[in-house]
Every structure is written in structure tokens, then in C-alpha cells.
Amino acid sequence: MSKRRIAPLTFLRRLLLRILAALAVFWGGGIALFSVVPVPFSAVMAERQISAWLSGEFGYVAHSDWVSMADISPWMGLAVIAAEDQKFPEHWGFDVPAIEKALAHNERNESRIRGASTLSQQTAKNLFLWDGRSWVRKGLEAGLTLGIETVWSKKRILTVYLNIAEFGDGIFGVEAAAQRYFHKPASRLSMSEAALLAAVLPNPLRYKANAPSGYVRSRQAWIMRQMRQLGGESFMTRNQLN
């Protein structure tokens, strides 16, 4: 009787290990490939597309027009760093002090959860993982973050991030966002336009760059102040990010 009970558990354990090994090979290959090849789509794009099809929205197309860092305004890279991860050039994927502050805040305010994900973490999860919150997903995110930080340069991480970030419903990547909201290529975005796009990133399905709320406008102004404090465009050159 005991052997019959153990056998299924052994089978499930082996199956789980094989699945994890296959995912490790898949993700490892993706990290290596996308270190040099433009990213055609992300896990978030795929999830949005499948969700739209299941809802009968067959006209929805999740798509991103890849552009190199040379074709992105330096203001845009600076804006997302100022808004999301000011220690981006310094850390190895994780901002430990920010994580500690977020944990302390979340213990005091359970209804208003604060995140502390770096641009590297956001790139890893947007590119490779499903949406949601769980310890399993966090563990995978940490491993993938270490992977891209090890293989990719900071400039590459920022380039991929800007090309797969969601700026609105069905609007992925800074080139699509620049064309949709400002009718210009990403290379010509001004400081204020870049800050406005960065201002919607916490929740691009709620906050609108084409109809900014008072909160979005105040966040845009804060981001612009942070951009100036970081040193403006020279910050990007100094840290070899453009």
C-alpha cells in the first residue's frame, strides 16, 4: 500500500523537476538570445492578447515597434529611472533599502501596498512571467533578474524595458506610445512628454497619458524635478546608458 502511495508522489516530483528544468532552459535561452536580438513580444503582451481573444475582442493587437536606444530620446530613459528606479546604474537588480522601506510600509498599511521593484525586476517579469502575486512568482522573478543583470548591460536592460513597457491599453513600447500620444517618433520626445509617459507606468490601464488626471500631472511634475536633480541628460551619458 505504501509503495502505491509513494509512486504517484515520486512521479509528480520528477514531473515538476522536469518542468522546472525545461523552463530554466527556455528562460536561459531567452536571456542569451535577447541580449542581442530585438524582443518580438513579451509575456505581458501575450497575456493581454489571449485575454482579448477570450473576451471576443478580435480587433485587439498587442504589438511593439522595436527601436534601439539611439532612436529613443535620452529624456525617456532618464524619466523612467527618475520615476521608478533612481539607483538603477548602481545596483545588481535589487534595491535592498527600498525593499526594506516597502516591507515596513506594507506592515503598517495593509490596504495600500507599496512595491519596490527595480527596472531590472520589472523587465524580467514583464518579459518572461505571468501577471499576479505569489511567492513562487517572486522567486522566479528574482532568478530571472539575476540572469539578465549577469548577461545584459544596464543599457540593454533599459532598452528592453522601454520597448516592452505598457503605456496604455494595447500600447506597448515607447515608440508606439510616442506615435499614439504625441504623433512623433520616440527619438523626438521632450522632457515633459517623457515625464508624462513615465507618470502612467504604475498603472497604465488606469492612468491615461492622453487624458491625464490631476494625480498624473502632479506625478509628471515630480518626475521632472527628479530628472533635473539627477543631472539631466548628462546622467545618461555619465552612466553609459545612451
Swiss-Prot record:
Group of enzyme by EC: transferase
Name assigned to this protein: Biosynthetic peptidoglycan transglycosylase
Entry's localization field: Cell inner membrane
Entry GO MF terms: pentosyltransferase activity; peptidoglycan glycosyltransferase activity
Native organism: Salmonella schwarzengrund (strain CVM19633)
Alphabetical list of PANTHER family matching this protein: BIOSYNTHETIC PEPTIDOGLYCAN TRANSGLYCOSYLASE, MONOFUNCTIONAL BIOSYNTHETIC PEPTIDOGLYCAN TRANSGLYCOSYLASE
Function: Peptidoglycan polymerase that catalyzes glycan chain elongation from lipid-linked precursors.
Gene3D superfamilies referenced in this protein's UniProt entry, alphabetically: Biosynthetic peptidoglycan transglycosylase-like
Encoding gene per record: mtgA
Family (UniProt): Belongs to the glycosyltransferase 51 family.
